[in-house]
């Protein structure tokens, strides 16, 4: 097992799986983002999660969107045990409802995506 840190009542590995590649967010260039989207099918996402878990990682941090939730639902149904830290999906307008849905889904942690926070801060509508 990899080194862990306390996270509420859980211990999560200090190394966690990041979900940006699964959704084509390379932060490098559009071509790489496109290649990631083409490569990471549902099956490849689940295989990647399983490989990470097999190597001792116990947590994934990813968007809490419909695709990622579907992948995780299948992964968990097939015996996967990764903890899920969810980032809110900026395209969903009901932030409070989305956070509640992610909690019901099983996210062990939820954070608001930075673009949502930035936009509301700049508009003076941050609550």
Where are these regions (language model features)?
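Active-site-adjacent beta->alpha loops and helix N-cap segments on the catalytic face
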Residues: 64-80, 91-98, 116-127
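Glycine-enriched alpha-helix->loop->beta-strand junction motifs that scaffold or abut catalytic
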Residues: 77-81, 103-109
């Amino acid at each position: 097992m990899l080194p862990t840190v306390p996270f509420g009542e859980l211990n999560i590995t200090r190394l966690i799986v990041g979900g940006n590649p699964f959704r084509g967010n390379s932060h490098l260039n559009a071509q790489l983002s496109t290649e990631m989207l083409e490569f990471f099918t549902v099956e490849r996402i689940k295989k990647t999660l399983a490989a990470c878990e097999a190597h001792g990682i116990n947590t994934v941090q990813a968007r809490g969107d419909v695709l990622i939730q579907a992948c995780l639902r299948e992964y968990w149904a097939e015996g996967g045990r990764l903890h899920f830290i969810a980032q809110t999906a900026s395209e969903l307008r009901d932030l409070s409802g989305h956070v509640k849905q992610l909690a019901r889904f099983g996210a062990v942690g939820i954070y608001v995506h930075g673009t949502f926070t930035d936009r509301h801060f700049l508009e003076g509508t941050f609550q």
